[in-house]
């Protein structure tokens, strides 16, 4: 009897340990919508796609929303597809109109990483407040880029994190199966040619004719560098108070006061569009991808292993903000960024206004 009870105990311990190590034994639910996107000017369209869970059971389809090209840095189009189980497998077939090709990918997904990111979530700054709230992601975004590049992200409010990069292969799909209607005497090539003419802008067609499709660009976007944003004010009272950053690799984040105060270097993709808020001014800057790739690669080659600073230097009265990249004792000015504008008031005016607001709030 003693031996029987001992064996039973060991079996229970083994089962409990096994359940503890398998994250999918848990009943956690993270509802999400599936979205699709593609680089601006390089339209893609889903033919058929779906996600399976770890038991190879269907979770949902990949939405068919027509041609998509909303941009690599944005969440893209929804189409009524989603679920709350952790996806473990993706099947996707789509057409790349710029390349006149169909692609297919059949791939296992890093389910444990997806679960980890759902659990970790992110902190979101509350509107007009320094307080934050803990949220998690609500969208699973599928990105399709030229060359069969497929990237998955988890997307939330002002936050986006890459899950994995997959490689699709060229595949034949009959145009009539894709379109589900037959145009008599139309060849497969004529179908591609017509879609190419209709889906691409004249400017991008000319660009492709002269320089070709920039294969590899979206993998260059994925390279990360150890850097931080640095503010070089002419008034020592001024400082960063908030940064909302989109990166060319499709990731996004808010950098809040506690992290800004640490002034730490972080591994990130090159910046795309950033909203910088200072003590009393704010600005929005769009960085040029080619310039940033060139400068960062140059700095990495000349200063291996050293962290990099992107420095913002305002001119008097914030009429303009100069941007440069610095590593050790070398500093390179940037010229191709676009500054959307500078908004705000002087620090003295801001301090006076805030003091009045505080006094009024206290009933004085």
What is each of the regions a protein language model found here?
Residues 117-218, 299-364:
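Compositionally biased low-complexity segments at domain edges in trafficked proteins
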Residues 15-18:
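C-terminal motif of bacterial Sec signal peptides marking the signal peptidase cleavage site
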